[in-house]
């Protein structure tokens, strides 16, 4: 540890000029740091991930490569190993718990039932029995109550066997101790605590030991003096969240937590059974390609070896890491908190809605897993071959290759891993302003790291020479900061489909092209942090304001306000749903009255379900649109491509398909009004003629 501390101080001296043997007091660090770290706008320290923060300690050229190797060995690899072991532990406990419940079906069925004569359930009794057995203090319970609940378990041999086995599968010396709010939890939360708290501390021991040496208080003072207070705070925040495994700030009151959950629910409603998102996830397959051992040609060669490729694919898909990603919402910060809020939740309406929204993430999770296995299989096998050539044994090569695969996956896919989440994203403000920006933030960081490696003439991890590193980094910058966004939005808006129409609508194509370009710019801006999000909103507000000012007829001022509300993405979503619902009701008033109430195409259903979804987060509008999509996908009047895209989640609006039934009703109403007008005109003529005749006859 002394050598590690000495080496880090030498690195600081090389990068910052601060003498490696000197010490800086807290006050001196604060005074010196107050002048540093300002005007970092593109991915500032508060929006960096852990590795991005480490990049500040890396010098230029060969020295920079040595610095990178130091952090790789001391921090990055131990961290990735710790997460792999944690995933294995969590999956092992989950499997054992599932097996336990199968072995004791009668016990499982009565766990939530109340014990006769007591205000407690059998599940409470099991937990209290184990806590009492291991001499844990149980907050809020009297000795009499503890003895009564323990006796229930002791006098029921099956329940006792269940409880004792439960302690074994928790893989701890004693059953996890209760907290002050233990009544809000259950056996599942106890097992989660066994891994996320106690178990986490064990598997992260090596990483944490190195962190304590490298980022000691003395060294943090030097860091503050060199990089500023905001940098030091961002680093400490990231290290704390990595240690605890929690992204939500601690100490928030119940109302703040409830509001945050409500906002997260808005994100969940958008992602509910989002098939289009699952399909677009497959774009990330190319994230595993590089200019080294998994280039286009070697990846193709691995795919050509079909038996080995599918064996690796299945191994990855069924690995503990990938199972963890689909076992909870581990791909999105807001989604992960939504899932966390369910732990120990009772069957209240709020808990039921949250559970529904969590289940709605499943298609996206499966899409994410398929993309990882499909792109990762060739990467993994090529990396195994690389390590075998370097002299590693088969087992060592496979283990090291999987750790590399895990690192690439977590850094290029969406991830809610605390070290991959910035201080901004983890804050209450970030949950609202940076919602849906998990992956764009990752991409911006990749692009920034690539630029810094080129600028400082460093060889990036995975490259064997400077030229290979430079080519790879130019490719990363081009793809992650430009091409990926353009491709994504052209697919999301179905712009590609419109270009293949027999009679392409140039005006619609131009409109979608503008949207694609603006959205791509917004992705880079929002992915750079809160400041970029503000710039994005102001840009879009000015554009929308000018659009409405240029309209000669019926300008929509609410659209300008709507753009401003997009600073808080979930609030903007709710605002659009309510505004669009009101517009639908106003513009289609006569159509709604003319059509049958229970006609699925009646605009009233689109409007009302949007209003309900906006207010309650219950994804009724998503369900309504899914039903229509399935019906339209079976409609032979549409082209094969249109039907396929409708089935995969693209809307009629995305594909430029008009709602013919509503259009026909509008035409019918228009014709009816025209005929009514003619009739009125004719009647008026008759009345006028009669009046003239009466006057001529002297009446």
Language-model features and meaning:
Residues 15-16, 58, 226, 316-322, ...:
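Short, aromatic- and cysteine-enriched interfacial helices/patches
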Residues 1, 77, 84, 95-98, ...:
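Basic, mixed-charge low-complexity alpha-helical segments
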Residues 21-25, 29-33, 87, 91-112, ...:
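Flexible coil/linker segments and helix-coil junctions enriched in charged and small residues
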Residues 507-519, 544-570, 574, 581-582, ...:
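Membrane-proximal bilayer-interacting regions
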Residues 1-205, 260-265:
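Noncatalytic N-terminal accessory/assembly modules of large enzymes
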Residues 191, 195-198, 204-521, 548-555, ...:
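Hydrophobic, often aromatic-rich secondary-structure segments at membrane interfaces
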Residues 28, 44-46, 50, 71, ...:
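Hydrophobic alpha-helical segments
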Residues 433, 440-447, 475-495, 517-541, ...:
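Membrane-active amphipathic alpha-helices enriched in small hydrophobic residues
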């Amino acid at each position: 540890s002394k050598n590690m501390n000495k080496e880090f101080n030498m690195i600081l001296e090389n990068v910052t000029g601060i003498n490696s043997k000197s010490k800086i007091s807290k006050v001196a660090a604060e005074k010196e740091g107050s002048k540093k770290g300002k005007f970092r706008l593109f991915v500032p320290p508060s929006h960096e991930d852990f590795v991005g923060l480490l990049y500040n300690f890396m010098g230029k050229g060969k020295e920079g490569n040595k610095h990178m190797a130091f952090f790789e060995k001391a921090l990055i690899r131990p961290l990735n190993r710790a997460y792999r072991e944690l995933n294995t532990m969590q999956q092992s406990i989950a499997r054992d718990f599932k097996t336990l419940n199968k072995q004791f079906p009668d016990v499982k069925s009565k766990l939530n039932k109340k014990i006769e004569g007591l205000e407690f359930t059998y599940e409470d009794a099991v937990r209290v029995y184990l806590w009492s057995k291991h001499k844990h203090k149980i907050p809020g319970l009297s000795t009499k109550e503890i003895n009564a609940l323990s006796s229930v378990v002791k006098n029921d041999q099956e329940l006792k066997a269940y409880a004792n086995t439960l302690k074994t599968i928790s893989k701890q010396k004693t059953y996890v101790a209760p907290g002050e709010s233990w009544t809000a939890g259950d056996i599942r939360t106890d097992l989660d605590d066994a891994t996320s708290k106690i178990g986490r501390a064990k598997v992260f021991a090596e990483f944490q030991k190195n962190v304590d040496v490298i980022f000691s208080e003395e060294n943090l003072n030097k860091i503050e003096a060199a990089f500023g207070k905001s940098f030091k705070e961002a680093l400490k925040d990231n290290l704390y969240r990595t240690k605890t495994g929690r992204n939500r700030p601690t100490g928030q009151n119940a109302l703040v937590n409830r509001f945050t959950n409500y906002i997260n629910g808005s994100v969940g409603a958008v992602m509910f059974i989002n098939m289009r998102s699952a399909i677009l996830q497959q774009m990330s397959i190319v994230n595993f390609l590089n200019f080294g051992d998994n280039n286009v040609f070697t990846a193709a060669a691995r795919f050509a070896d079909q038996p080995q490729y599918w064996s690796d694919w299945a191994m990855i898909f069924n690995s503990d890491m990938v199972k963890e990603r689909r076992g909870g919402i581990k791909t999105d910060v807001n989604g992960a908190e939504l899932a966390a809020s369910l732990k120990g939740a009772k069957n209240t309406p709020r808990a039921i809605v949250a559970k529904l929204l969590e289940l709605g993430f499943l298609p996206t999770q499966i899409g994410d897993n398929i993309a990882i296995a499909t792109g990762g299989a060739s990467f993994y096998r090529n990396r195994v071959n690389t390590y075998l050539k370097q002299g590693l044994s088969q087992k060592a090569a496979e283990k090291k290759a999987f750790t590399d695969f895990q690192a690439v996956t977590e850094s290029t896919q969406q991830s809610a891993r605390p070290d991959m989440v910035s201080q901004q994203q983890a804050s209450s403000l970030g949950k609202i302003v940076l919602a849906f920006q998990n992956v764009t933030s990752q991409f911006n960081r990749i692009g920034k790291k690539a630029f810094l490696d080129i600028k400082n003439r460093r060889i990036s991890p995975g490259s064997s020479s400077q030229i290979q590193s430079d080519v790879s980094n130019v490719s990363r910058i081009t793809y992650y900061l430009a091409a990926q966004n353009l491709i994504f939005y052209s697919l999301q808006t179905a712009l590609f489909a419109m270009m293949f129409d027999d009679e392409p609508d140039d005006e619609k194509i131009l409109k979608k092209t503008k949207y694609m370009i603006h959205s791509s710019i917004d992705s880079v801006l929002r992915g750079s942090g809160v400041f970029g999000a503000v710039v994005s909103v102001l840009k879009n507000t000015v554009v929308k304001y000018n659009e409405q000012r240029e309209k000669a007829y019926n300008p929509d001022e609410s659209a300008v306000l709507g753009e401003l509300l997009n600073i808080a993405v979930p609030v903007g979503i709710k605002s659009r749903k309510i505004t669009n619902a009101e517009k639908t009701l106003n513009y289609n008033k006569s159509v709604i009255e003319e059509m049958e109430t229970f006609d699925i195409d009646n605009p009233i259903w689109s409007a009302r379900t949007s209003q309900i979804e906006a207010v309650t987060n219950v994804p009724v509008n998503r369900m309504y649109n899914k039903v229509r999509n399935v019906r339209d996908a079976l409609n032979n009047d549409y082209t094969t491509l249109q039907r396929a895209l409708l089935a995969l989640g693209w809307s009629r609006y995305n594909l430029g398909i008009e709602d013919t039934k509503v259009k026909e009703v509008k035409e019918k109403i228009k014709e009816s009004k025209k005929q009514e007008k003619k009739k009125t005109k004719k009647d008026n003529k008759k009345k006028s003629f009669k009046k003239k005749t009466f006057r001529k006859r002297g009446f």
